């Protein structure tokens, strides 16, 4: 009969179902942008407010060159808009570590592509992000226009020493 062709597809959809159980999604409106990698989303269902740390990326700190530009750029992309936040964990500060989707675009990746954030390569090995940072660096986009930009991680460490 014909039903043999259906089986692999069915198994595949089961696999995707089980995978998606490990991740959750918040759908809501962006009501705040704190900096280039932290936002606040109001959940559509119960209007609960979630602080979201954009996963896989590290934007310049506010005191750094490009810190404000990164914040403004992120705002221009998503502030006041409906987004979907996919996440698997919450950090020790109670922030949701998520990937933001808006109008079909993966916003975390867009930030890296345009030179408004570094790829957080220490924690994340996603090939698209590695490639995006290489390309932005090569094209001297955003923060890469500076010949020696300081990684936000290093910057935070140097601030703590003082």
List each model region and its residues.
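Small beta-barrel nucleic-acid-binding modules, primarily SNase/OB-fold domains
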Residues: 2, 7-162
């Amino acid at each position: 009969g014909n039903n043999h062709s259906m089986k692999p597809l069915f198994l595949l959809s089961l696999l995707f179902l089980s995978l998606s159980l490990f991740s959750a999604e918040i759908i809501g409106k962006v009501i705040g942008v704190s900096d280039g990698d932290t936002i606040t989303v109001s959940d559509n269902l119960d209007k609960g407010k979630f602080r979201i740390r954009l996963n896989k990326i590290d934007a310049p700190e506010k005191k750094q060159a490009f810190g404000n530009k990164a914040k403004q750029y992120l705002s221009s992309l998503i502030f006041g808009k409906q987004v979907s936040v996919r996440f698997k964990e919450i950090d020790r500060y109670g922030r949701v570590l998520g990937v933001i989707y808006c109008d079909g675009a993966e916003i975390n990746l867009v930030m890296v592509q345009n030179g408004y954030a570094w790829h957080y390569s220490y924690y994340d090995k996603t090939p698209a992000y590695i490639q995006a940072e290489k390309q932005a660096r090569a094209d001297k986009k955003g923060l890469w226009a500076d010949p020696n930009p300081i990684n936000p991680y290093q910057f935070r460490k140097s601030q703590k020493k003082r």
